Amino acid sequence: MFVRALSLRDFRSWEHVELELSTGRTVFLGANGNGKTNLLEAVGYLATLGSHRVSADAPLIRSGAQRARVGANVVNAGRELRIDVELNQGSANRAQINRSPVRRTREILGILQTVLFAPEDLALVRGDPGERRRFLDELCTARLPRLAGVRADYDRVLRQRSALLKTAGRHARSTADLSTLDVWDGHLAGHAAVLVAQRLRLVHDLFPYLAEAYRSLAPESRPAAIGYRSAYLPGEFLDPARAPRDDDAAALEEIILRELAAARRKELERGVCLVGPHRDELELMLGDTPAKGFASHGESWSFALALRLASFDLLRSTSAEPVLLLDDVFAELDRRRRTALAAVAADAEQVLITAAVPEDVPAELSATPIRVATAGEAGHRTSHIVTG
């Protein structure tokens, strides 16, 4: 899989750009703030409908513009598709496949797959549980694009159920409120079970790739492992050696419904939903010790990189090889990690890299350079490709 063409209009610092790309390695070169990372962010957005840098879409729209547009021609196994997304201020985003509108933007998911490694990835190890849940869910969705709808439905039901818990808790828990809560419990459990089943399957499948990737990056370190942690699931589901089963979602739905009923009194008292995948955690371990809070800076970098390399290997083992995005990371890595990452990049179908100077990129990658610069007055500078 590779991106043959990329177009941006009013996206971040780019007023307009049309790029022709090829397989192999391309490096966008430029000083910090020139907009090179915005190009990778745009490619990643088309793959995930989200940014690795911000949680909302508004910052992606160029200052002074009402909307931004991102599009790409994606080639996979000889077949080319065009995908476009329009990000709008104050209204719903819109998407097209081959210039034809689709009902929901998430219908483009799966056409382009990417794996991105960026300095922000240190938060996968050192950050809050939400960072690791997002990592799980984005990778699950890359493997099963229809899961995007399940995630959206779960988030919607969670918001509505949480609002009802607050209302019912304040108003003496009327029979009508409690009856409505029963209905929302059923919806929540159904969506949650599908999401948790896919997370468990992913952790099981990713584990051997993660262990091998970390071993190659830090052979002298303790072995790395991942596990799924949940307060409401029986231990049998959390055993990393347990193979996922096709009927897991049905069994999980019954468990979650039972746990919701048991937790209802506490939930009404506190006005929050205490059961569900929004409270679960991806556990990262080095030997018998949690990586968060105990791993050194070097170990944390190795674990973050191993998670991304494992994701890349897992995706290409089961579907089309994803586009590898490397955002200003070679300068952050020591020799061993640079060598390991360069080996993967050298073998990938398409790699898009950002760097401040050519020397930051290993020479053996022989990357095609594209220089990026900015022009204009302070506060209104726009990015452009340097030609000639």
Swiss-Prot record:
Gene Ontology BP terms: DNA replication; DNA synthesis involved in DNA repair; double-strand break repair; SOS response
GO cellular component: cytoplasm
Binding-site positions, ATP: 30-37
Main subcellular localisation: cytoplasm
Pfam families xrefs: SMC_N
InterPro entries: DNA-binding_RecF (IPR001238), DNA-binding_RecF_CS (IPR018078), P-loop_NTPase (IPR027417), RecF/RecN/SMC_N (IPR003395), RecF_2 (IPR042174)
Protein function: The RecF protein is involved in DNA metabolism; it is required for DNA replication and normal SOS inducibility. RecF binds preferentially to single-stranded, linear DNA. It also seems to bind ATP.
Database matches in NCBIfam families: recf
Official protein name in the record: DNA replication and repair protein RecF
